[in-house]
A protein has these predicted regions:
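A structural signal for short hydrophobic beta-strand segments in well-ordered beta-sheet cores
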Residues: 25, 141-143, 208
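Ligand/cofactor pocket segment of small-molecule handling proteins
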Residues: 130-133, 137-146, 154
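Conserved donor-nucleotide/metal-binding helix-loop-beta segment in metal-dependent transferases, i.e.
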Residues: 105-135
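Conserved N-terminal catalytic core of the sugar/cofactor nucleotidyltransferase
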Residues: 1-5, 13, 26-27, 31-97, ...
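Short beta-strand segments
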Residues: 6-7, 96-99, 126-129, 210
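Catalytic-core segments of class I nucleotidyltransferases/pyrophosphorylases
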Residues: 95, 117, 147-234
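A conserved hydrophobic position in a structured secondary element of the catalytic/binding core
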Residues: 55, 104, 143, 171-172, ...
Length: 234
């Protein structure tokens, strides 16, 4: 299993700080947030960790220069999450951990890998339950038990099929790269991972795993400070 950490975002919600320090390198306790995510990938059993970065994030490469299991690829254009993942295409099952999504309170990736093994190596998407009034902010799962039937992007409260939302972690088969390569660009010319996964669902089962930890979006100041508080409390 190879881990992919998309970390090419420009961090505009954290300006002017991110002109100097990439958001993924902001400290959580005494360590950069990205290092905690790399450790999560290792704990899940990833043999190699590919970090997708953009120009200007060389500080990230410098920090991990002595980590033999970490390598870097560049996303030269900001064309969506699917496009970022595609830059790191490998012939292996992939664990995708969003670089601005920190999970506090559990090792979500490890638990997802164990869940996948219990289900015959099935694809697994890490999820969280969200309040009904917030479903319009997330990709929401349509489920049959734990099996994913469909994914609905940012539905209204009335249209939401559940309160189970995508939460920054994916464990997918290598064939996802074939779907990404043939995925037509969507809004803004972006290639979205969710669209490719939906196509894959037509031929392959995938499951939602609601992990017990708390996801924090460290890509914005409020989420970052919430992550700091949660990390200290944990």
């Amino acid at each position: 299993m190879t881990a992919i950490i998309p970390a090419a975002g420009l961090g505009t919600r954290f300006l002017p700080v991110t002109r100097v320090v990439p958001k993924e390198m902001l400290p959580i306790g005494s360590r950069p947030a990205l290092e905690l995510i790399v450790d999560e990938a290792r704990a899940a059993g990833a043999r190699e960790i590919v970090v997708v970065i953009s120009e200007g994030k060389e500080l990230v490469r410098t920090y991990f220069a002595d980590a033999p299991d970490v390598r870097f690829v560049y996303q030269r254009e900001q064309r969506g999450l699917g496009h970022a993942v595609l830059q790191a295409a490998v012939e292996d099952d992939v664990l995708i951990l969003l670089g601005d999504a920190l999970v506090v309170g559990c090792c979500a990736a490890k638990e997802m890998a164990e869940f996948s093994r219990r289900h015959g190596g099935a694809a697994v998407i890490g999820c969280e339950r969200v309040p009904p009034e917030k479903v319009s902010r997330y990709g929401i799962m349509k489920l049959d038990g734990e099996r994913i039937v469909d994914m609905v992007e940012k539905p209204s409260f009335e249209e939401a099929p559940s309160d189970v939302a995508v939460a920054g972690r994916y464990l997918l088969p290598a064939e996802i790269f074939g779907y990404l390569r043939t995925q037509p660009p969507g809004k803004g010319g972006e290639i979205q991972l969710t669209d490719a996964i939906r196509r894959m669902l037509a031929v392959r089962e995938a499951y939602a795993y609601v992990y017990p930890g708390r996801r924090q979006d460290i890509g914005n100041p409020d989420g970052y400070f919430a992550a700091l508080s949660a990390y200290r409390a944990n």
